[in-house]
């Protein structure tokens, strides 16, 4: 056997397979950028910014980082909303508080659900569309977004039904 294989095993021992950040278990075998995108509210652009703020190479494997670097990443995730411009956040001008925040994980899901429920309650146009289960953002609905499995009109079946109905009456 070669001497390289034990070194690979030693690297695997140092690797954390799950890294917990903000109520989310992240895959430690992925790069920092890719692992952070598994969190709700963090996309590729935000993940790059967080990696820069934490002074970590975005291509490094997340589970191979030492505890200090992981703590830096956690701190960068928590402080992200305070350090970036307003247009880079995901929850701008909250209805009740007027604050601009960047929400992550369950907080983001709850705030979106509350916003939709408020729109439904006051019967705003978007709220009515949400109630009816229709498209909200102005997409066409005549031909796209159909939920039924039927395709077109079967003219022959309609003619047969009319012939049967007409034959019974005579």
UniProtKB/Swiss-Prot annotation:
Sorted alphabetically, the Gene Ontology BP terms of this entry are:
translation
* Amino acid composition bias (Basic residues), ranges on this chain: 128-140
- Gene Ontology cellular component terms for the protein in this record: cytosol; small ribosomal subunit
> What are the boundaries of the region Disordered?
128-170
What are the UniProt keywords, alphabetically? Ribonucleoprotein, Ribosomal protein, RNA-binding, rRNA-binding
> A single GO molecular function, which one?
structural constituent of ribosome
What InterPro entries does the record point to? Rbsml_uS13_C, Ribosomal_uS13, Ribosomal_uS13-like_H2TH, Ribosomal_uS13_archaeal, Ribosomal_uS13_CS
Q: Name the SUPFAM superfamilies for this protein.
A: S13-like H2TH domain
Q: What is any Pfam family matched here?
A: Ribosomal_S13
Free-text function comment from the UniProt entry: Located at the top of the head of the 30S subunit, it contacts several helices of the 16S rRNA. In the 70S ribosome it contacts the 23S rRNA (bridge B1a) and protein L5 of the 50S subunit (bridge B1b), connecting the 2 subunits; these bridges are implicated in subunit movement.
Task: Give the UniProt family note.
Answer: Belongs to the universal ribosomal protein uS13 family.
Q: How does it assemble?
A: Part of the 30S ribosomal subunit. Forms a loose heterodimer with protein S19. Forms two bridges to the 50S subunit in the 70S ribosome.
The record's listing under HAMAP family reads: Ribosomal_uS13
Q: What is this protein called?
A: Small ribosomal subunit protein uS13
Q: Which gene encodes it?
A: rps13
């Amino acid at each position: 056997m070669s001497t390289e294989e034990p070194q690979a095993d030693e690297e695997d021992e140092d690797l954390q397979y799950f890294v917990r950040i903000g109520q989310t278990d992240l895959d430690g075998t992925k790069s920092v950028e890719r692992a952070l995108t598994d969190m709700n509210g963090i996309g590729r652009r935000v993940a790059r910014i967080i990696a820069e703020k934490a002074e970590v190479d975005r291509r490094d494997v997340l589970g191979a980082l030492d505890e200090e670097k992981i703590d830096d990443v956690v701190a960068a995730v928590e402080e992200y909303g305070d350090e970036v411009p307003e247009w880079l956040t995901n929850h701008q001008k909250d209805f009740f508080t007027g604050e601009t925040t960047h929400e992550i994980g369950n907080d983001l899901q709850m705030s979106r659900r509350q916003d939709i429920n408020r729109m439904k309650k006051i019967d705003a146009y978007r709220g009515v569309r949400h109630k009816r289960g229709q498209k909200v953002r102005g997409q066409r609905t005549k031909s796209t977004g159909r939920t039924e499995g039927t395709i077109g009109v079967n003219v022959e079946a309609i003619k047969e039904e009319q012939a049967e109905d007409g034959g019974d009456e005579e």
